[in-house]
C-alpha cells in the first residue's frame, strides 16, 4: 500500500504539521479530503428490503467515489440503535434520546494512523481517483433489540452509519485513538499530545462525509410459547344486603319486615328481591326468622344469587396479525336483564412514554376494534354466556415492552352495563376522526394469508381504516359511571407461530364440543354470540343456542381457539342431516347418511298421501324427460276441492287424456318429420351413394348433371331449414348424426318466401319439393 502511494504522491516533509500555517503552498495539502473531493459516498446492502432479526449478519458494501487522489483517510462503519422521544407543544415530556447500542469498526485505514508522524512516515494510506468499494459484514446484537417503529411522538430506530475523513479528525474524535486519558500517567506521550493539539485546529478543514442507512429490526415473539392466560373474575356483592340484615335483626316482627323490603325492592327490579338474609339470622333469639326459613317465599328467594359474578376468558395469550381473538364472557346476575347495548368489547392499544429519570409517564390510547353486544340474562337461571371475537388489524405491530422510553401493549377491554337500563348511543359518544395518528400504523398487506413472517414496514403517514375507527364508541364517559363494570386482560401480538399444529387441533376439539352440545341444548339457555364489523372468517361451532333476533343477521359460529388465515380451510366437517331429531349424534360415524330415495320412500311410507308415480315416457325425448323430472321435484300443491279436481290435470300423470292427446300429436309430428327426413336422405343416398342407415348395402353413382343440381339445391335448403331438425323429437333408440351446414356456398344463397319459412313444429313432408324452385344462379354452385 505504501509503495503504491509513493508512486502517485511525491515524498516530502509534512510542512503543514510543522509550521502550523494552513495557507502554506505545500503540495501535500492538495491530497487532503475536502468538500469538493468526494463525488459519491453511500452504503449498498445485499438485501436492502429485508427485515432483520437479532443475531443476523448484514452484508453490504460502502461505495466511495473520489474526484482526486487522497491520502491519510479513514472509513468507519457504525451500528447504532436508539430510542427517541420528540418534542410536543401539548406534552410535558421534553425531547430525549437514549442509545441502545453503538458499535464502530474501521473499514479502511490504520488503527494508529494519527501517530505515524512520530515514526517519520509521511503517509499511511491513500486512494486513487475513481470508485472504490469496501465490503463489510456486521452481526446484529442479541440483547436490547426492540421492534423498529417510527410514530408521531417518537421512534425506535436502527441504522448503519458510514463516515470518511482524515486520520487526524478520527484521532481526535475516537476514544480509542485519543491518548488524553494516559497523558497524566505517562510522560513519554508528549509527542502524541503535541500532535493532537496541532490537529485540533484542523478540524474545520478536515470535513467528514457521512452516509446513513436505516434498517428494520424485528424482535421475534413466538405466540405458541406464551403461557395460557388466566380468566379474569370479578365478584360484586349487593351493599343493600347488609342493610337489610341489620334492620331485620332489629325489627320486632320478621314477617312484616320481609313484606316491607319486598315492596321496596319491587320498584328497582323485575322479580322478587333476594330474601336469603334470614340465613344469617338463625340465632337462638330469632325464632321467627327460623320458622319462616322454609316458607315458599324464602324458597323462591334462595334460588336467586346474592352476588354478581363476571368472568372473562381468552383461550390464548398471543395472536398474530389478521387472527381472531375469541372472547368468552360468563355473567351470573341477581335479576333478569335485557339490554340491547349492554356489552362493549374493545381491542385497545396503549402507548406509554416516559421521560427517563424524571419518572414522568404519559399514556395514549387507541381503539383498534370494537363490538357492541346485547346482554340477555335468563330469568330462570340468571345466567348469560356471551361469545364474540375481535380481529387483530393488519396494521398492528408486535407488542413492545421493556424498552427504556417507549412501550406498546394490547388489551381486551369489556364494559358491561349491569344496571338493566338500556344505553342510548348517540353521535356524541363516538370518537371524532382525526387527520394525524398518535401511534404508528403500516400499510395493509395485499395478501395477509401469505408471508406473514417478519414483514413489517411501519410509518407515521398511514391512516388505516380511519373512517371505520372513527365510528367507535368512546368508553371514557361510561367508565366513570357506577352502573358499568370494567374488565381488562392483556393480549400479546406476536410475529410468528412455530407450533402450527395448535391451530389444527382446534378443529378436532371444536368437533367434540359440537357433538357434546347437540345433546345439551335446552330452550331456557340464552347464549348470544356476535362478530364485530366485517370480520367474517371460517370459524367453527363451539357453543350452540338461541340468539336474539337483533343479532341473527350477522351471527357467525365461533371457536375458542383462533384459526390463522394462512391455514387452508379443508378440515371442516359438516354435521349430517337427521331425519329424526331424537337420534343420538354420537352414532353419526356408525350410521350411514340416507340417500334421496331412502328418505323419499320413508316419507311416503309414513305419509297418508299417495305418492305421485313418475311416468316412464320411453317414447319421449330426453329433453321432455328432464322437464318431467324437474316438475316432479317442485313443491306439492295444496289439496283442492272436488269441483276443481275435475278441471285440474297434472301434467305428469300418464292417465290424463290431455297428456295423451299431446303425446299423440307429438308422435304425428315426429312421424311427419321422420318421413321427410327419410325421403331427403334416400334421394341424397341414391345420388351420391353415401352410407346411410336406410341404404347400408347398396350404393349408386350419379347418372347425370341434373341429379347433382337437385342435391345441391337440397343442401342449400337445409342450410336455412336446419332448425327444423333440432326441434323434431326422435326416438331414444334411434341414433342421430351430427350435421354441419356448408358455408362455402353462401354466396349463391337467395331469400326464401314466407311460405317456406317454418318454425320447426308445423312442417309438412312436401317442403323439399317446394324449396326446389331456385334461380339460374345455382347452376354454377358446383
From Swiss-Prot:
GO terms for molecular function: protein-macromolecule adaptor activity; ubiquitin protein ligase binding. Residues 746-756 have a biased composition (Basic and acidic residues). Residues 708-717 have a biased composition (Acidic residues). One of its GO terms (biological process) is ubiquitin-dependent endocytosis. Residues 275-297, 517-562, 570-585, 757-782 have a biased composition (Polar residues). InterPro entries: Arrestin-like_C, Arrestin-like_N, Arrestin_C-like, Arrestin_domain-protein. GO terms for cellular component: cytosol; plasma membrane. Required for the proteolytic cleavage of the transcription factor RIM101 in response to alkaline ambient pH. PANTHER family: ARRESTIN DOMAIN CONTAINING PROTEIN, PH-RESPONSE REGULATOR PROTEIN PALF_RIM8. Belongs to the arrestin family. PalF/RIM8 subfamily. This is pH-response regulator protein palF/RIM8.
